[in-house]
Design a protein with these regions (language model features):
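Generic structural signal for hydrophobic core residues of well-folded globular domains
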Residues: 101-102, 124, 161
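Conserved non-catalytic scaffold segment of RNase H-like nuclease domains
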Residues: 1-107, 111, 132-142
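Acidic two-metal-ion nuclease catalytic site recognized across multiple nuclease folds
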Residues: 137, 142-164
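Acidic active-site catalytic centers that drive phospho-/nucleotidyl reactions
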Residues: 9-11, 94, 116, 150, ...
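Short alpha-helix plus adjacent loop in nuclease-associated cores
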Residues: 114-136
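Generic hydrophobic secondary-structure packing signal
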Residues: 69, 130-131, 150-153
């Protein structure tokens, strides 16, 4: 089992296929322990509705002030992820946005090995991945106030599924 990997997540401004990526996040694990973090807002002109803003915890103003271009954000993201196996929580969802973005901006698609937790959970538990289910089913505990906890839980779930 590999204990060195990167848990990745993208955030979009909606769930439909026309939605845009508004952030990239990644948490690197080495020897099964989180060691490095990456986060970048994207300022591509995508608009967040009030309801999406409430769910995500950031606003259009946040994207405009702190976001970088899609190209810069993605290059930083793939640089951070280079050399590591990637763990996703919902690969089917994330991949369609990443692939479309790569086509639109003429950027390279990630070539890392990818493992999808949603698929792993469906095979083992007959239901998809969720942070709460992973915590309860696998007995994972984290600091409730840590904004990175959802990536930490995903990494620990990946490790736990390979041990059991």
């Amino acid at each position: 089992m590999k204990n060195d990997f990167v848990v990745i997540d993208i955030t979009t401004n909606g769930l439909d296929e026309d939605s845009e990526i508004v952030s990239f996040a990644a948490l690197r694990f080495e020897n099964g322990v989180p060691t490095d973090r990456f986060f970048e807002y994207v300022n591509s002109g995508a608009v967040l509705s009030d309801s999406i803003s409430e769910i995500l915890g950031f606003t259009n103003d946040t994207l405009q002030r702190y976001g970088t271009t899609m190209e810069d954000a993605y290059w930083q993201f793939i640089e951070f992820c280079s050399g590591g196996d990637l763990i996703t929580m919902h690969h089917d969802f994330d991949s369609k946005f990443i692939e479309r973005m790569c086509r639109e901006y003429d950027l390279p698609v990630l070539e890392n090995h990818i493992t999808d937790l949603d698929t792993m959970f469906r095979l083992k538990y007959k239901r998809g991945y969720s942070t709460r289910f992973a915590e309860n089913q696998l007995g994972i505990s984290t600091d409730e106030t840590d904004e990175w906890r959802y990536l930490d839980i995903a990494g620990k779930a990946y490790i736990a599924l390979h041990i059991n």
